[in-house]
Amino acid sequence: MDFLPLFHSLQGRLALVVGGGEVALRKARLLADAGARLRVVAPQIHIELRHLVEQGGGELLERDYQDGDQPGCVLIIAATDDEPLNAEVSRAANARGIPVNVVDAPALCSVIFPAIVDRSPLVVAVSSGGDAPVLARLIRAKLETWIPSTYGQLAGLASRFRHRVKELLPDLQQRRVFWENLFQGEIAERVLAGRPAEAERLLEEHLAGGLAHIATGEVYLVGAGPGDPDLLTFRALRLMQQADVVLYDRLVAPSILELCRRDAERLYVGKRRAEHAVPQDRINRLLVELASQGKRVLRLKGGDPFIFGRGGEEIDELAAHGIPFQVVPGITAASGCAAYAGIPLTHRDHAQSVRFVTGHLKDGTTDLPWQDLVAPGQTLVFYMGLVGLPVICEQLVAHGRSAQTPAALIQQGTTAQQRVFTGTLENLPQLVAEHEVHAPTLVIVGEVVQLRDKLAWFEGAREDA
């Protein structure tokens, strides 16, 4: 190990930055974020760097560096494009025993800056020892996606209760087990879900009860998006990997289901038109029953759970029974499939609004507000509209929409099996029969469809027409 990782307390302490350009500004921002007072020396100083120093009550020395600029400093940064000057700053710092960093010159450094993931008070540092800084930044980028932004709040919660827990659990091993359970349990999940006050209340109750605790279940209502696993949110993926039970729909792609925790129980509750594997009211009750057993229940739905996903009905039942839940939105099919098909839903020249419409109603009909749907300057997106497509096209034309209005069918959008067929209201039902189009298929109607010829970028199954 060429460098020993340490964390340096700079709160209220003086740091010298030699240099006044963009590079010096970047280093100065890091120092200021750590609470350091800045002394900047350079003949010319970047305007933003000047403001940064002034805001922090630091010192601006608009002149050349001098050997006497170091007194009182606990850290020195050389950030100029003058190599002899940088070497001089390094020699002077080393002679005085002051840690020094010279930008892009590891051999002249006694300390180096890592790539930083900041979830203060939790901080993660990644370093290549100056040998491969780009690689360190790439690793940091991965960590940024893996570590939730609310981990800082979680660490802060632990800090506030640390001494009380130590009093209740004087044994080190017992404390370690306590914190491990807390960081992986419902209290941590409340923080990560954006409910820190609730988490603190639960922890208070837990400690007041002498650490006796009964596990409380929770339901995660998660949108799985339109099919491409890369479109999942970070939060969705995290919850998928910690749930005890998964209730999933027919529209959840197998590749997404595979990302769930391996040992989680999986229950298929999918539906298709006139064929419900599990009735909706039974799904609602099942969520309540499983969560009441203390289980973490993942309700995984294709697209977004609040857009034609009946998510509102499910959480209404949970709320009525006092079951904790959180909702994770997903990319809805209209947005995802249209984007992968190269069809912008709005466009300044073609559509100033977009309307999402269900293709069949609760009683199986397509009794829709047709007059509203033929208003100019709008794009229509029909979910579950394949069976009722002949009626949809007929009624739109009957109520004033041109039979030559561009329209598209997007089957299994955003996946490798995606197929897109474009036509008009007049021939769209015929395309379904000719190409044996099947569900899940999204229907888009509007002038924006004609832009697909120019904007299509995703290949999919390459059977488009």
Swiss-Prot record:
It comes from the Bacteria. S-adenosyl-L-methionine binds at P226, G302, G303, D304, I307, T332, A333, M384, G413. Then it catalyzes the NAD-dependent ring dehydrogenation of precorrin-2 to yield sirohydrochlorin. Finally, it catalyzes the ferrochelation of sirohydrochlorin to yield siroheme. Pathway: Cofactor biosynthesis; adenosylcobalamin biosynthesis; precorrin-2 from uroporphyrinogen III: step 1/1; Cofactor biosynthesis; adenosylcobalamin biosynthesis; sirohydrochlorin from precorrin-2: step 1/1; Porphyrin-containing compound metabolism; siroheme biosynthesis; precorrin-2 from uroporphyrinogen III: step 1/1; Porphyrin-containing compound metabolism; siroheme biosynthesis; siroheme from sirohydrochlorin: step 1/1. NAD(+) binds at E22, V23, P43, Q44. Residues 1-203 are annotated as: Precorrin-2 dehydrogenase /sirohydrochlorin ferrochelatase. Its EC number is 2.1.1.107, 1.3.1.76, 4.99.1.4. Keywords: Cobalamin biosynthesis, Lyase, Methyltransferase, Multifunctional enzyme, NAD, Oxidoreductase, Phosphoprotein, Porphyrin biosynthesis, S-adenosyl-L-methionine, Transferase. It catalyses: uroporphyrinogen III + 2 S-adenosyl-L-methionine = precorrin-2 + 2 S-adenosyl-L-homocysteine + H(+); precorrin-2 + NAD(+) = sirohydrochlorin + NADH + 2 H(+); siroheme + 2 H(+) = sirohydrochlorin + Fe(2+). It comes from Pseudomonas aeruginosa (strain LESB58). The modification Phosphoserine is found at S128. Residues 217-465 are annotated as: Uroporphyrinogen-III C-methyltransferase. The active site is at D249, K271. In the N-terminal section; belongs to the precorrin-2 dehydrogenase / sirohydrochlorin ferrochelatase family. In the C-terminal section; belongs to the precorrin methyltransferase family. This is Siroheme synthase. InterPro entries: 4pyrrol_Mease (IPR000878), 4pyrrol_Methylase_sf (IPR035996), 4pyrrole_Mease_sub1 (IPR014777), 4pyrrole_Mease_sub2 (IPR014776), CobA/CysG_C (IPR006366), NAD(P)-bd_dom_sf (IPR036291), Siro_Cobalamin_biosynth (IPR050161), Sirohaem_synt_dimer_dom_sf (IPR037115). One of its GO terms (biological process) is methylation. It holds the Pfam family Sirohm_synth_M. GO terms for molecular function: NAD binding; precorrin-2 dehydrogenase activity; sirohydrochlorin ferrochelatase activity; uroporphyrin-III C-methyltransferase activity.
